[in-house]
Structures are given as structure tokens and as C-alpha cells.
Amino acid sequence: MLKCQKPLFSLDENVHYLNCAYKSPLLKNGEEMAKKALLSERNPFNLKPHSYFEISDKIRIEFSKIIHCHKNEIALFPSTSYGFANVFNNLKVTRVKAITVENEFPSGFFSIKKWSLENEIMLQTLTRNELSAKDWNQKILDSIDEKTNVVFMSSVHWMDGTKFDIKKIGKKCKSVGAYFIVDGTQSVGAMNINVKEFNIDALICAGYKWLFGPYSMALGYFSSKFNNGTPIEESWMNRTNAQEFSNLTDYDSKYKTMAGRYNVGETANFVLSPIMLNGLKQLNNWGISNIESYCKKLADPLLKQLIPLGIKFEEKNYFNPHLFSLGLPDYIDNINFKKTLDNKNIYVSLRGKNIRVSINVFNDQNDINMLIEAVKSVLK
């Protein structure tokens, strides 16, 4: 069993940071990588042509281990919105309907909305209302049919942590010939995601949450369906002759194979890339399954103590131990409760009406106990 990894971070000892879904803290060795990278800018003569490509390739290798694909199916971006723009700019129109779920994160939602409007596709947003997580998942499955062009959704709902059965959803998409596009930002790095097994056609992830990377870096997987697509920019770095610096004005029009064409320009990002690479290496060192187990170990006592007191959580099969919401009684004002937590140095997020809690390996039982006691203090 993985032990608490708090010594690897510089978190304030007096803070109970249960908010990795907001932003992960920087690893100590990530700090060192950033310092070293910044200082290297003093002497640019040390940069060789291969320096512009090596670190990006290492990032692809590490990320491909996490989501179980080939490194050349990975592209690097500055943001998820950049990744989604590449995805939806290359989505073929073959049907009349697109599907998403309610309250998706704006970057992805606006991308599919724009694509649907431009192509005169009906965008069906599947609401939950009072449905259980199980019935909401079933509603999604039942809505996917031969008229469906694309299904876009998160693997974990970013506002309340509801787990979607993306394996079943991906299988249904494949059976009817629909694209399956997934925002993996709130799951990849904290739970096992296998893009091949789940029949995912494109997966886009921000780097600064569960991947322990920096802000302004994101990663994406593109299946073979996108191998011949057109990127949203024409970076010289994405051409097959990019490493031949003396021949760049031969203007080789051929893109790199597979997802390489979708990389953002200036892909190397010499200052931020070392932080991203360090975070991915650390995840692979810990092991995603071990991270899942550790989060479950912390979440289980919380459920055991709070459920008998009337606090509601998702049912077992749809509960994520790394990201979930507290179903507090109606008489508790969530905004005031969030302020109460802040005053106790317990940091969570308020998303809509949800008190969102997100656990990771830098948390310990004391963090959980403090949250439990804070909840008990406001119950009647």
C-alpha cells in the first residue's frame, strides 16, 4: 500500500488541502526542475537541434504509459481548449445528432456547441435531474443510436465527481459508429484509463491537476481516426524535416505521423516541460492503481462516519474516492459552510451547489478527520 507522499511536497503544515481537482501542489523535485530549466536560459548556446524535440518525446512516452497507447498518438498543447479545437476541427459529419451531458466544463462544451451549430447538428444535452448516477449512465447509453455522430463527455463529472461508465459508453459508441471524445482532466492520473479498451477516439487532459504538471500545459490522445487531419496551426516543428535546421526552407509539407501534427508550436516549452515530465514520471513511479487504493483508504472512513449522520454520497459503483461531493442537509448553506472550512484551513471547492472534495497522495488521515469534524460541527 502506498504511504502518504506529503514529504515530497512543500504544502504548509497547517493547511488541509483537499482540492487537487482545483490545482495540484508542485512537487519539490518539480520545483528543482523548474529552477534548473530557468537557469539554463542563461546559456542558449547549449541548446542543440535535438534539444527542441527530446523532452516532448519523453513526455509522450510517460503519458502513453498512463493511458495505454503509443507515444506517437500523443500531442502537447497549452490548454484543453486548444486540444478540443483540433479534435472538433477534424470531426467528420456523418450523422444528425451530437450528445453531451449537462454542466460540462465550458472549454469542451463550447467546442462541441460550435461544431454542432456550424454543421447543423442537433446537440442533445442529457440532464440528470433527480436521477441516480446509475440511471443517468443508463440514460446516456440509451441515447446513443445510429443517428449519433459524436458523444463528448468527461470520464468523471468535474462538479460533483459522478463516475461515468466510459467503458460501456465507449463500447456503445463503437457499436453504432459514433465518435467518443473524452475530457480526462479530472480522472487521468487518479484512476485507470485505457483509451484502447474504452474505445476512446480522443482524450484531452489539463496538466496542472492530477498529472502534477504546470499551468499552461495539456496533453491529448488521438486515435487513428485523426491520423490524416488538419491541425489548427502550421508549426514548423510538426513537419517531418523539422530536425534538419539547415533545410527548413525546403518547406516539407508533410506532417509528422499520427498525432504529431496536432502539437502546439514551440512544443519544447523549455521552462514548463521539465515540470510536466517530472509529474508524469512520478505518477508512473507511484502507479495509478496504488493512487486509487490510497485515495480509497482515506475516503472509506469519511463515508463510514458521515453516512450514518445523513450525509449523502454517490452509490458505491459510481463513487470516486479521489473526487466527490458532500450531500449536506438542505438547512446548511453551502456558501457559508465553505467559508467555515476556509477559516479552518480546510480547502475544498464550491462548484454549483456542490461542496467538492478531492483527495490525493499528499493527504493524510488528519486531513480527513478535520473535514469530518467540520461537517459534524454544522449538523443539527
Segment roles from a protein language model:
Residues 1-380:
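Pyridoxal 5′-phosphate
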